[in-house]
A protein has these predicted regions:
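Short acidic, hydrophobic short linear motifs in intrinsically disordered regions
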Residues: 32-41
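Short, cationic-aromatic polyanion-contact patches
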Residues: 13-18, 70-89
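Short capping segments at the starts of secondary-structure elements
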Residues: 25-33
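Basic amphipathic alpha-helical segments that dock to polyanions
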Residues: 22, 53-60
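Short alpha-helical segments that sit at the start of domains
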Residues: 2-25, 82-83
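A short, conserved structural fragment
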Residues: 60-69
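Short helix-coil-helix linker/hinge
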Residues: 15-18, 31, 97
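Amphipathic alpha-helical dimerization/coiled-coil segments
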Residues: 88-129
C-alpha cells in the first residue's frame, strides 16, 4: 500500500510499505542511526543491512528523512499523523468519492466495536461538535 507524505504544503510523495517500515522505526525511536534501524528491521522482519540502507536512501531522496552526520543519523521530516491523515484522505477520495460519512459508515458496518470503543467514538464526535 502507498502512503503520502508532505512536500511543501501538499502531500504528494508516495511512501511504499517498505519505506513505511523504516519510518515507523524512526517515529518510534526518534533520531536514530541507520545501523540501529538496520538492526531493528533485521530482528523484526529479517531485512539485511543492504536492503535497509537502500530503503533509507529512498526515504531521503523522497524528502521523508534527513541524513545527519556523524554516524548517518536519520531524522524524520514528516510525522506519523501527517502520513495517517493523508492516507485517510486518499482512501476517502479513492473509495468513497471523498465522502467521510460514507467511509465512516463502511467502517461501522464492517467491524464490531467494544462498548468502550463506541463510548470513545461518541465522545470524539461530541468534542468535534462543540
Amino acid at each position: 500500500s502507498i502512503k503520502y507524505i508532505k512536500k511543501g504544503d501538499k502531500m504528494d510523495i508516495k511512501l511504499f510499505d517498505s519505506e513505511l517500515a523504516v519510518m515507523n522505526v524512526i517515529w518510534e525511536h526518534g533520531d536514530i542511526t541507520a545501523k540501529e534501524i538496520s538492526d531493528i528491521l533485521k530482528e523484526s522482519i529479517g531485512w539485511n543491512i543492504n536492503t535497509t540502507y537502500t530503503v533509507i536512501k529512498k526515504c531521503i531522496a523522497k524528502g521523508a528523512v534527513e541524513r545527519r552526520e556523524p554516524k548517518f543519523i536519520c531524522h524524520a521530516l514528516i510525522t506519523r499523523e501527517e502520513v495517517q491523515k493523508a492516507s485517510v484522505d486518499e482512501l476517502s477520495k479513492k473509495m468513497f468519492g471523498g465522502s467521510s460519512e460514507l467511509m465512516f459508515a463502511s467502517l461501522l458496518a464492517n467491524r464490531s466495536f467494544s462498548k468502550k470503543e463506541i463510548d470513545n467514538l461518541k465522545k470524539m464526535i461530541q468534542e468535534y461538535e462543540d
